[in-house]
């Protein structure tokens, strides 16, 4: 168990700490990271997501429908809870609340999920990990981007009252959502899904070219996350502890309950629950940095979730292995 967790978590911490100390010691500029954000979010991760989905046989994807539904519900529930909590209890604006909600609601299955589930359950679990990435990329991610886009355009102050004002606000949200779907991080997994469903095969030279770009996703994303976090103060406060409780304890518990409610098979229940138990993802922090929205709660919660994750992941691995 210790070796499995070490193999999965030590590389994650190494990447985060490399970026963190590189920024802290001024080896890298932690204030002007837009170019690195563009590389990670518009090239590396989209290539990785596209290949993961496109390379999955259609029959295997069909078997993931129930797991995908469970993951979508799990992500949406914690996203909504986190957004409402930070918006009305912590008094954050809509942009900052969406960044925190995505950080807590979308686990780091990109960097942690693949090695951890492969170590615990074998290579057969990687399809569910790819599904989890696709679900997060086409649900809570575009919602966050829509909120950030709307805030950037100043749509929070839409004029009008009554039905006309509400209609205008809804129209602005819809336009922002459509605009967010133009981003590679959103449409790449959808394109991969289309390739898989159509049984299309990429030429080997294109596959290898995309694989080269996609292979840079994990390391560059972790370094970028650490770099962004290094520009902020890490604070352990009451809301940080609440954030960790929501992510590391509540989300996997919700996942387990939903899996049982929809009668998901034991194997998929284990996968979905353990994916939900992963520490915070980096999409929220990176999206926020791209839109100049950097709530301390997001970065503090992210770091704290990894520190607590060493113990909480071990506990959830034991729990899921006793299911059934």
What is the predicted function of each stretch?
Residues 1-324:
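Alpha-helical transmembrane segments of multi-pass small-molecule/ion transporters
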């Amino acid at each position: 168990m210790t070796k499995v967790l070490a193999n999965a978590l030590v590389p994650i911490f190494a990447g985060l700490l490399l970026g963190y100390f590189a920024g802290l010691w001024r080896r890298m500029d932690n204030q002007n990271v837009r170019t690195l954000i563009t590389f990670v979010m518009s090239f590396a991760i989209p290539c990785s997501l596209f290949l993961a989905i496109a390379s999955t046989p259609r029959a295997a994807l069909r078997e993931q429908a129930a797991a995908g539904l469970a993951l979508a519900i799990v992500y949406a529930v914690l996203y909504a809870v986190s957004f409402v909590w930070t918006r009305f209890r912590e008094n954050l604006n809509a942009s900052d609340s969406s960044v925190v909600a995505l950080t807590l609601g979308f686990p780091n299955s990109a960097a942690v999920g693949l090695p951890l589930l492969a170590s615990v359950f074998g290579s057969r679990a990687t399809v569910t990990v790819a599904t989890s990435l696709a679900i997060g990329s086409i649900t809570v991610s575009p919602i966050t981007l829509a909120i950030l886009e709307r805030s950037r355009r100043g749509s929070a102050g839409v004029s009008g009252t009554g039905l006309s004002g509400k209609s205008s606000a809804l129209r602005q949200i819809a336009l922002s959502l459509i605009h967010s779907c133009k981003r590679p991080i959103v449409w790449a997994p959808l394109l991969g899904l289309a390739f898989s469903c159509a049984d299309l095969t990429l030429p080997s030279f294109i596959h290898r070219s995309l694989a080269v770009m996609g292979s840079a996703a994990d390391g560059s994303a972790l370094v970028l996350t650490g770099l962004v976090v290094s520009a902020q103060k890490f604070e352990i406060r009451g809301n940080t502890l609440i954030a960790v409780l929501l992510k590391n304890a509540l989300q996997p518990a919700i996942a387990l309950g939903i899996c049982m409610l929809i009668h998901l098979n034991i194997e998929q229940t284990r996968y979905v629950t353990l994916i939900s138990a992963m520490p915070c993802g980096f999409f929220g922090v990176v999206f926020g940095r791209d839109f100049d929205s950097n709530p301390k709660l997001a970065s503090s919660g992210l770091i704290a979730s990894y520190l607590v994750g060493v113990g909480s992941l071990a506990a959830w691995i034991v729990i899921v292995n006793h299911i059934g």
